Amino acid sequence: MQAARGGAGRPGREGRGLERECERSPGPGVAMPPGPCAWPPRAALRLWLGCVCFALVQADSPSAPVNVTVRHLKANSAVVSWDVLEDEVVIGFAISQQKKDVRMLRFIQEVNTTTRSCALWDLEEDTEYIVHVQAISIQGQSPASEPVLFKTPREAEKMASKNKDEVTMKEMGRNQQLRTGEVLIIVVVLFMWAGVIALFCRQYDIIKDNEPNNNKEKTKSASETSTPEHQGGGLLRSKI
């Protein structure tokens, strides 16, 4: 009889408890429930009420945030931003942050705010992080958003990028100054050439205007030397 109840050997605690529940005989006129043992009515009612309450809470809780992105990424800080559905009233947010492959978790929560971004600080450079975002409403918290993985840059890389930008700006300024100087030199040379050409044209006009007077003087001097006159006014004649 003992082997039939609990199998071979003595029955365990679960077997004895089941036997006690099943050995309780109902009152007169009450039918026995089917099976070896039926759940008590109170336990079934509590389970049903718990399921209904859980379903109601899940129906009223907000949806998970969408479009979760990480921007303004630096070696020791970053900014997480997200969006929520328009027809949902959200009064806060909760962010869980952890390193990849590390169980340590940082939890950031803020209520009575409508902001859609949060700054992450005290990050380690060249490290991968995972963040989840949850929306908070009066009914409770939403499910966690899709995980977002990001990696912080190295401080040396950030400084190198910054120095490269500064060098580029300086080179652009120097090139602009050189171009301005070259333009000024070209303009000065052009003005000088224009002045030289104008002076040459003026001298050429003066020489051209004086040329007829010189020709008249040359003709007059040539005529005087070719026909010499006598002191008395007559021409000299040779004696034969």
Swiss-Prot record:
All copies of domain Fibronectin type-III, residue ranges:
64-155
Residues spanning the membrane: 181-201
Q: Which residues are glycosylated?
A: N67, N112
Q: Where is the composition biased (Basic and acidic residues)?
A: 11-24, 210-221
Q: Which PROSITE patterns match?
A: FN3 (PS50853)
Q: Which tissues does it occur in? A: In adult, it is highly expressed in skeletal muscle, heart and brain.
The UniProt keywords, alphabetically, are: Cell membrane, Glycoprotein, Hormone, Membrane, Peroxisome, Secreted, Transmembrane, Transmembrane helix
Please provide, alphabetically and separated by semicolons, the GO molecular function terms listed in this UniProt record. hormone activity
Q: What induces it?
A: Up-regulated by muscular exercise. This effect can be mediated, at least partly, by PPARGC1A.
CDD domains hit by this protein: FN3
Q: Which domain of life is it from?
A: Eukaryota
- Motif Microbody targeting signal, which positions? 238-240
What does the record list as GO biological process?
positive regulation of brown fat cell differentiation; response to muscle activity
Glycosyltransferase: is it a keyword of this entry? no
How is this protein annotated for GO cellular component? endoplasmic reticulum; extracellular region; peroxisomal membrane; plasma membrane
Q: Where is the composition biased (Gly residues)?
A: 1-10, 231-240
Domain observations: Fibronectin type-III domain is capable of forming a continuous intersubunit beta-sheet dimer; dimerization may thereby play a role in cell-cell adhesion or signaling.
The record's section on PANTHER family has: FIBRONECTIN TYPE III DOMAIN-CONTAINING PROTEIN (PTHR14470), FIBRONECTIN TYPE III DOMAIN-CONTAINING PROTEIN 5 (PTHR14470:SF1)
Query: Which protein is depicted?
Result: Fibronectin type III domain-containing protein 5
Organism of provenance: Mus musculus (Mouse)
